[in-house]
Amino acid sequence: MQANDITFFQRFQDDILAGRKTITIRDAAESHFKPGDVLRVGRYEDDGYFCTIAVTATSTVTLDTLTEQHAQQENMTLGQLRQVISDIYPGESQFYVIEFKTL
């Protein structure tokens, strides 16, 4: 069985498959992805494969510089996005935006 390259919490799977979630915001541990990368995507909870994505762009962001556009690309409000990022990465300040499309 082939390993997954990136995982998402299961709660985001439907939004990714429907094209409602088109970015992911990660910490430095996952800052190595670059435009053109094709990634196998799995669920964080069980590592089950559910789609393949292509990275279309990358950029850096801080919690304070997140915008409404980031929130729309995550299919959340800006307040929800800031809370989710703070919950997943407590104490972190520098993040990496990975824009993608499903293949």
From Swiss-Prot:
Belongs to the N(4)-acetylcytidine amidohydrolase family. The active site is at K21 (proton acceptor), T24 (nucleophile), E74 (proton donor). The keyword Hydrolase applies. It comes from Klebsiella pneumoniae subsp. pneumoniae (strain ATCC 700721 / MGH 78578). Its EC number is 3.5.1.135. This is N(4)-acetylcytidine amidohydrolase. It is an enzyme of class 3 (hydrolase). SUPFAM superfamilies: PUA domain-like. It holds the Pfam family ASCH. InterPro entries: AC4CH (IPR008314), ASCH_domain (IPR007374), PUA-like_sf (IPR015947). SMART domains: ASCH. NCBIfam families: PRK04980.1.
